[in-house]
Amino acid sequence: MVANVSGIGSVLQQMQAMAAQANGGVASPAAALAGSGAATAGTFASAMKASLDKISGDQQHALGEARAFEVGAANVSLNDVMVDMQKANIGFQFGLQVRNKLVSAYNEVMQMSV
């Protein structure tokens, strides 16, 4: 139960960092990513790869928890499964929105006259 509380605290901290960045409270997106532990290197590509790997890992973990609950594992509760599934869903939705913004920015740059 203590691990669940610290996990929720970690997610809450990441959400607060993203909210501060959206409101202009964080100087740069790299600072928010560094604070959340998502970026390990200074390049955009490595930050994207780390974020995608984390999203994928969260999804795999949630699926593993769901399968364990389905077969009746004693150490897996429905609450844990639901929280992990929601964390994976939120991460995926965030990644999808980042992708949409990147595609939109790319299209805007491509439409600029040189």
From Swiss-Prot:
<dbReference type="GO" id="GO:0003774">
    <property type="term" value="F:cytoskeletal motor activity"/>
</dbReference>
<protein>
    <recommendedName>
        <fullName>Flagellar hook-basal body complex protein FliE</fullName>
    </recommendedName>
</protein>
<dbReference type="GO" id="GO:0009425">
    <property type="term" value="C:bacterial-type flagellum basal body"/>
</dbReference>
<dbReference type="Pfam" id="PF02049">
    <property type="entry name" value="FliE"/>
</dbReference>
<dbReference type="GO" id="GO:0005198">
    <property type="term" value="F:structural molecule activity"/>
</dbReference>
<comment type="similarity">
    <text>Belongs to the FliE family.</text>
</comment>
<keyword id="KW-0975">Bacterial flagellum</keyword>
<dbReference type="GO" id="GO:0071973">
    <property type="term" value="P:bacterial-type flagellum-dependent cell motility"/>
</dbReference>
<dbReference type="InterPro" id="IPR001624">
    <property type="entry name" value="FliE"/>
</dbReference>
